[in-house]
């Protein structure tokens, strides 16, 4: 798949603020600072379209980006960042859970996992939530440029069926975009 056009559309703090045009959505979720925004920029071929930060917890809204005028990438707030107030964390948990459980136009969820650390307890909780509600998701291991060849080979053996990407080197970009295209062509939306 070739990305010809990508634009920021809107940020939303609740379900009522989400686009209502029914276009397929690919949500990016993972721990704070796992590289969601950097990965989206790499996939979209735009260095600064999606705001990035070295400081965890930068994304605090559901951020929508229209791609090729036909589908959305949705940057979700990261989980596991404790410097936010408990009430703010609880509010976001409710909004994100409702989005993941009820959004009809959600084509897939990319669950991002830092390849250096593997699946951590917060990731396990998200996987359990997604499995419990039978929500389709695709594991994507990020920051593969930080691994040695041997470490990467072991990670790929342990996590077959997952994608392995680097926003720095571009590794995995074509495979992930091909997957997006296949999903769109199959019309495989959440029922």
Language model: regions and residue ranges:
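Conserved G1/Walker A P-loop phosphate-binding module
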Residues: 1-83
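Canonical P-loop GTPase G-domain recognition
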Residues: 3-16, 145-191
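Signal for well-folded cores of large energy- and translation-related assemblies
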Residues: 13, 44, 97-104, 131, ...
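Structured catalytic cores of enzymes that bind and process phosphorylated ligands/cofactors
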Residues: 26-34, 40, 63-66, 70, ...
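Conserved nucleotide-binding/hydrolysis micro-motifs of P-loop NTPases
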Residues: 58, 71, 78-81, 116-118, ...
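Conserved nucleotide-sensing/catalytic segment adjacent to the nucleotide-binding pocket
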Residues: 68-106
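Amphipathic alpha-helical transducer elements in NTP-driven molecular machines
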Residues: 89-93, 120, 170-173
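Conserved C-terminal guanine-recognition region of P-loop GTPase G domains, centered on the G4
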Residues: 94-161
């Amino acid at each position: 798949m070739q990305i010809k056009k990508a634009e920021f559309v809107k940020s939303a703090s609740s379900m009522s603020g989400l686009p209502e045009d029914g276009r397929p959505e690919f949500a990016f979720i993972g721990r704070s600072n796992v590289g969601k925004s950097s990965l989206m920029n790499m996939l979209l071929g735009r260095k600064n379209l999606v705001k990035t930060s070295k400081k965890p917890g930068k994304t605090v809204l559901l951020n929508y980006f229209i791609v090729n005028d036909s589908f959305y990438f949705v940057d979700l707030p990261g989980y596991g960042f404790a410097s936010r107030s408990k009430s703010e964390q609880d509010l976001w948990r409710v909004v994100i859970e409702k989005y993941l459980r009820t959004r009809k136009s959600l084509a897939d969820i990319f669950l991002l996992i830092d390849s250096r650390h593997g699946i951590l307890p917060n990731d396990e909780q998200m996987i359990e939530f997604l499995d419990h509600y039978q929500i389709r998701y695709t594991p994507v291991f990020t920051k593969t440029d930080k691994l040695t060849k041997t470490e990467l080979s072991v990670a790929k053996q342990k996590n077959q069926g997952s994608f392995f990407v680097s926003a720095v080197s571009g590794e995995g970009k074509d495979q992930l975009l091909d997957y997006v295209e296949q999903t769109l062509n199959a019309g495989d939306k959440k029922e």
